A protein has these predicted regions:
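Conserved GNAT-fold acetyl-CoA-binding loop/helix
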Residues: 31-56
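C-terminal "cap" of GNAT-fold acetyltransferases
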Residues: 142, 147-153, 159, 165-187
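Conserved acetyl-CoA pyrophosphate-binding loop and the N-cap/start of the following alpha-helix
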Residues: 119, 123-131
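Short loop/turn motifs at secondary-structure junctions and domain boundaries
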Residues: 57-63
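Conserved acyl-donor/pantetheine-binding loop and adjacent beta-alpha core of acyl/acetyltransferases
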Residues: 70, 76-120, 135, 168-177
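Hydrophobic beta-strand residues of extracellular immunoglobulin-like
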Residues: 65-68
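Conserved N-terminal entry element of GNAT/NAT acetyltransferase domains
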Residues: 1-24, 186-187
Length: 187
């Protein structure tokens, strides 16, 4: 039986920093997350266009700021934070800006959060946010920002993020609605 098809009764969530060896699992996890849950919020054309503006950003892995959440050795979720200007997008997304942010002046970025559809609503997103916020705070950042999909927005609102601006990204050929959100990090 496929390990993802088994019912999960009790989960033991573990986390670690992702490595290059995790790239195949990360790609599969992101593909499932984009294909599944986003379809409740976007048209099929928007879901397909999302693939152009979302995905693995290997800079986060190289910077050692990208977490992999596992359940019994299975990749269940991933996400990270960054001290770089880029707010969202994968290696293939045009317009990335690798310049560094300044703690205490700029907001750290929460980046590329995905949960496999089998593991939705089990605390994985909250766990990733906690890891990212704690790491950013430890590096001297007093606030974080992220760009949310329509599917992720409810999680971020529940975690005290506030809307900064709504916009659309049409680099995938169809406008995809997104929300820039932010949060103050309280010590």
């Amino acid at each position: 039986m496929d390990r993802l098809a088994r019912p999960v009764r009790t989960m033991s969530l573990t986390h670690r920093l992702a490595t290059e060896a995790d790239l195949p699992a990360l790609h599969a996890l992101m593909d499932a997350a984009i294909a599944g849950p986003l379809s409740a919020f976007l048209t099929p054309a928007q879901v397909e266009a999302s693939r152009m503006i979302m995905g693995v950003d290997s800079q986060l892995i190289a910077d050692r700021t990208y977490f992999l959440i596992e359940v019994d050795g299975v990749a269940a979720g991933c996400g990270g934070w960054s001290w770089r200007i880029t707010t969202y997008g994968g290696d293939h997304t045009p317009g990335r800006q690798p310049a560094l942010l300044t703690p205490g002046v700029d907001a750290a970025r929460v980046r590329a959060m995905y949960t496999h559809p089998v593991f939705l609503r089990r605390g994985i997103g909250r766990m990733i946010l906690g890891l990212c916020e704690g790491a950013a705070r430890a590096e001297g950042y007093d606030r974080v920002e992220l760009v949310a999909t329509m599917g992720g927005e409810p999680l971020y609102l529940a975690a005290a993020y506030v809307e900064i601006e709504r916009f659309e990204d049409d680099r995938g050929g169809v406008p995809v609605p997104l929300v820039r959100m932010g949060k103050l990090l309280i010590a």
